[in-house]
Amino acid sequence: YMMMGMLVSLTASCGNDWLDVESSTKIPTETAIQNLDDVEYSLNGIYDVMRSTNYYSGRMIYYGDVTGDDTQSIKTGKRTTSYYMLDYTKDSGPSSHWSYAYKIIQNCNIILSQIDGLDVSEDDTEYFNDLKGQTLALRGFALFDLTRFFGYPYAKDGGASLGVPIVTEVSNTENKPSRNTVAQCYEAIIKDLK
């Protein structure tokens, strides 16, 4: 009985707050950017995403070539075969191009939502402008990749056909924006690159 009494008293005295543990690997979006060093670290993370095999270290590079008629995938079972044969479904297709580019855009939007609120000294103004310029350029670059990959060529109809959604604010996974026209996409790209 004594053991059971101790067990009951120990479990009854515990609260549920031990279950509310903050993540040690994630930073809340609202407080992610506190200074220019945080911006630089975040940009390094974006560049790291860009060099993954799902983006510029692989699929983004060869997809355009192997789906055309100027190259050929000669061995079956290789990573280019399904693209070459156009043998994929809507669920197994080139979704990594979409998700990685929008991951870059989302991270850029997080930086841009907070960077103007930073207290920047006069000595750091050039550094600030460089970091903000890189962020805008990366967002525009990712939108350019998406537009040329998933949109109809601008020259075919003057950009009137559908391109991809333009996302310029921090969004959550439930946000499902509608597609913009190719012309609107290129306007947004040029705006980011100016």
What spans do the regions from the language model cover?
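Short alpha-helical hairpin
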Residues: 65-89, 166
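Secretory-pathway/luminal and periplasmic proteins that interact with or process carbohydrate-rich
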Residues: 51-56, 71-73, 142-153
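Glycine-rich, acidic and aromatic/proline-enriched surface loops and short helix-turn segments
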Residues: 149, 191-194
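Conserved, well-structured interaction surfaces
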Residues: 78-150, 180-183
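Short coil/linker segments at helix-helix boundaries
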Residues: 126, 149-187
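Membrane-proximal, proline-rich intrinsically disordered regions
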Residues: 14-61
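Sec-dependent bacterial lipoprotein signal peptides
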Residues: 1-12
